[in-house]
Design a protein with these regions (language model features):
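His/Asp/Glu-enriched, well-ordered alpha-helical/loop segment
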Residues: 2-104, 124
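A generic membrane alpha-helix/interface feature
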Residues: 20, 51, 118, 139-141
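Short alpha-helix boundary/capping motifs
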Residues: 57-58, 108-109, 143-147
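C-terminal cap of metal-dependent C-N hydrolases
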Residues: 82, 94-138
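Gram-negative outer-membrane assembly/targeting C-terminal domains
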Residues: 130, 139-150
Length: 150
């Protein structure tokens, strides 16, 4: 108990270190008292750890293990900091700790929630309601559109 386990939510069988795992892994380990870390080694997956944690939480619920939202959020915030031995400095919102903060318009574990504001190193860098603080998509690169020089 108390040992941190870095697991995927449900990406199993796609390579050797994920060969024989199960989607209920995070919930079963949490239920046994382990420190769970939902992780990804993919540049896209790392951007959606909140959704990955929600999938693992739902897999636990399906087998009768109810993981509170606060615990599931800790799987990608506080627990990685614990595993690296830096939880006294980061990983949770507490006075004196370093943090980048995302303010969501709903439950951060919901696929329907979107970030409203993002602070990095104390500076507001993204604000969904402020056009100057929203990134411009390069999806239509080279085509006339928002953000292009006219």
């Amino acid at each position: 108990a108390g040992v941190c386990s870095a697991v995927w939510a449900d990406w199993y069988g796609f390579k050797m270190e994920a060969y024989d795992a199960i989607p209920e892994n995070a919930a079963l380990l949490q239920n046994a008292g382990a420190c769970i870390i939902i992780h990804s080694d993919d540049e896209n997956g790392i951007q959606r750890l909140n959704q990955e944690a929600a999938k693992a939480q739902a897999d636990g619920r399906r087998i009768g293990i109810n993981i509170p939202d606060e615990t599931a959020i800790g799987w990608f915030t506080l627990n990685p900091a614990k595993a690296m031995g830096i939880d006294k400095f980061t990983g949770s919102l507490e006075k004196g700790k370093m943090a980048d903060v995302v303010l969501w318009n709903g439950n951060p574990l919901s696929v329907y929630s979107r970030p409203e504001k993002v602070w990095i190193d104390g500076a507001l860098l993204y604000d969904a309601l402020d056009r100057k603080r929203r990134p411009v998509s390069d999806f239509e690169l080279g085509q006339p559109g928002e953000g292009d020089v006219k």
